[in-house]
């Protein structure tokens, strides 16, 4: 019996700087293959810009609400793939202050890049792209890193945990995710 996929929530557009499709091309691809749900999760990461603390570098996330929710018969979810940036499970942008909006006007109060970018998204994928953040870490520490990264309510899943090469207690992380 073949395994049929009905959704893909870890896709990228050209905004991730290593993908070559637009959101429209991804939606049409998903519709042609019978997917019911497509999640676009471009990188919320320093790897997409030379100015990682500038909100203007991430305004494509803020503008995703113009996408149709149902597009060519496919439910389109608005997401991001946020880097896990430290062994404590912190996500990119959580500690990055932003004082100017995309037009260069000052905010009346300080915001974090993470909050501004993710506040209207449907979900996040949390991923390690730089395994050096856990260099010399114990199995317990890397396990706790992944568990902590799952704690923000926007985080729906972890991304490509095997690719990072970081060992962790899979069962502990899965049990934590299930309890969320």
Which positions does each model-derived feature cover?
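Catalytic domains of carbohydrate-active enzymes, especially glycoside hydrolases
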Residues: 26-41
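Extended substrate/RNA-proximal surfaces in nucleic-acid metabolism proteins
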Residues: 48-180
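Histidine-centered catalytic micro-motifs
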Residues: 6-17, 40-45, 158-162
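Short amphipathic alpha-helical segment that frequently serves as the phosphate-/nucleotide-binding helix
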Residues: 20-24
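Short beta-strand segments at enzyme active-site cores
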Residues: 38-43, 76-80
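Enrichment for repetitive, rod-forming helical segments
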Residues: 17-19, 167
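Catalytic phosphate/metal-binding cores of nucleic-acid and nucleotide-processing enzymes, i.e., regions
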Residues: 2-3
């Amino acid at each position: 019996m073949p395994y049929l996929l009905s959704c893909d929530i870890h896709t990228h557009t050209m905004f991730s700087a290593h993908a070559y499709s637009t959101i429209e091309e991804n939606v049409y691809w998903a519709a042609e293959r019978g997917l019911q749900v497509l999640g676009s999760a471009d990188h919320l990461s320093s790897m997409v810009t030379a100015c990682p603390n500038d909100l203007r570098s991430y305004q494509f996330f803020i503008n995703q609400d113009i996408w149709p929710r149902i597009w060519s018969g496919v439910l389109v979810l608005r997401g991001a793939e946020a880097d896990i940036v430290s062994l404590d499970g912190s996500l990119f942008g959580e500690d990055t202050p932003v004082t100017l909006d995309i037009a260069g006007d000052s905010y009346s109060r300080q915001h974090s890049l993470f909050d501004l970018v993710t506040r209207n998204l449907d979900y996040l994928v949390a991923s390690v792209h730089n395994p050096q953040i856990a260099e010399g870490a114990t199995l317990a520490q890397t396990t706790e890193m992944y568990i902590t990264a799952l704690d923000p309510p926007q985080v729906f899943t972890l991304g490509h945990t095997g690719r990072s090469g970081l060992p962790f207690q899979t069962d502990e992380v899965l049990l934590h995710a299930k309890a969320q």
